[in-house]
Every structure is written in C-alpha cells, then in structure tokens.
Amino acid sequence: MKVIFNADDFGLTQGVNNGIVKSHQDGVVKSTTMMVGMDAEQNAIELAHQNPDLKIGVHLRFTAGAPLTEHPNLTNGRTHFVKYSELWNKQDFEAQAVYDEAKAQIDHFLSLGLTLSHLDSHHHAHTHPQILPIVQKLAKEHRVPLRGSGICHQPMTTSYFFTDEFYDQKVSLDGLMQHLLSLKENYDVVEVMCHPAYADQPLIMKSGYALQRELELQVLTSPILKEQLAQHGIAVTDYSALVSTSQVVGV
C-alpha cells in the first residue's frame, strides 16, 4: 500500500507554512494544498519554490476569507464567504458562481508559477452536493486528482481511500499506524488528511484547531513513524500515485 500524507492549509499563516515545510523536510509529508488569497500566501510561495519536491494542490475556499470573485451568492451579501456553520444548510449555491470562484482560485495559483498537483477544499466544502459536480468538472479540465473522488478524467485501475481519522483527539502515532494497517489489505493508495503547524498567534486567532496541529507535527516528523511504515511495507507517496488508479471509496 502507498500512503499520501496531505497537509492542508498551506498559506493560512506562517506558522502553518513552517510546520508543513518541517513535516516535508524531516517527516512524511510529500503533498500539501494551498489556500490562495490568504495572509501568508507570499510566504507560502517563497517556501514552495525553496522546496520543489513538495507537491502542491489548491485547497479551495468557500468558508474562509474573502472570495476572489464578486458573486453575492457565495457570501450571502457579505464581504466574506458564508460561515462553515452555514455551509451545509445553504441549498441555493449558483453553479456559475461556484465555478467562477473555484476557477479564479486555481488560475491565481497557476499564475504564481506553481504546478497544480490536485484539488481539495477547506472544511470539505467541495463535498457539498451543489459544489461537488462543479469541482469534479474543474478537476477533469485540469486533469488532476480530487480528494475523495480520485481521478475524474480517466478510468482508474487500483483502489483509493481518503481518511480524515488523523485529527484532533485521534492524533497519535500508534493510532495512525493501527488505522493504516486496518486499511492495508483493502486499498492500494490511502490519503491521510493532516494539519501540521506551529501554533502562531495568527493561527490561534483564525482557527479553533491550532494547538492540536503541533502534536500532528510531532507525529509526522517522528523517525519511529518512518521506521514503522517501512517495516510494514507502506510507501509514502503523493498524488501522482493516482494517475492510473480506478476504484474509489471515501468522501
């Protein structure tokens, strides 16, 4: 089995950026997704160019910060996106507004001189039933994988599973290994969502999930994790492993 440790929220704060890079340089993270248009974007760009082996996708925003477009449908008439607490009850997303915003974020990412690895979203917003088909369309257009859907633009030949079990109270090295071993016989590629970071003041102000990220960072950079993965024949990879995969289970 191969495992993708994808670090979310690149670009959110410098503490997040530095934690992701640390987990890449000294740990098992080979993949991250960037929130464009956030306060630490420029710092993320600099770190991305300094770490060319770190694969980077777009962490689409529909619940954090301000949109890049001006569709009031995405903000309920405010200056910022709808709140996470409002997302799942909102049933009037306009397809064109969602498409234009997601495309604007992807286009902005590409304008930075970065190569698009894959797509996912903040707060799993892309799994909203009115948003998912639009993001799948964009994944097809850019011929990149989408979290939870795998490859949308061609048939896949091996099984892929996305897990969000490595989060909050479930963060531990032993728990992570037990979870991966429980999946090993059933899937070829597993993506583990993760959020390594240094809990700087901007992160504490922006997110209710801040201090816990430092524990994730400790686990993801532990030499013991690398040893145990190797011992059990689990290879660390990135989303390029999904280029020719087929069967999808997950979000």
From Swiss-Prot:
Superkingdom in the source lineage: Bacteria
Enzyme class name: hydrolase
GO biological process: polysaccharide catabolic process
Coiled-coil positions: none
Residues the record lists as binding Mg(2+): H59, H122
InterPro entries (UniProt xref): COD_ChbG_bac, Glyco_hydro/deAcase_b/a-brl, YdjC-like
Gene Ontology molecular function: deacetylase activity; hydrolase activity, acting on carbon-nitrogen (but not peptide) bonds, in linear amides; metal ion binding
UniProt xrefs under Pfam families: YdjC (PF04794)
Enzyme Commission number(s) of this protein: 3.5.1.-
Cofactor: Mg(2+)
Keywords carried by this UniProt record: Carbohydrate metabolism, Hydrolase, Magnesium, Metal-binding
The protein's role, per its UniProt record: Probably catalyzes the deacetylation of acetylated carbohydrates an important step in the degradation of oligosaccharides.
Protein family per UniProt: Belongs to the YdjC deacetylase family.
Subunit structure: Homodimer.
Protein name from the UniProt record: Carbohydrate deacetylase
Naturally occurring in which organism (per UniProt): Vibrio parahaemolyticus serotype O3:K6 (strain RIMD 2210633)
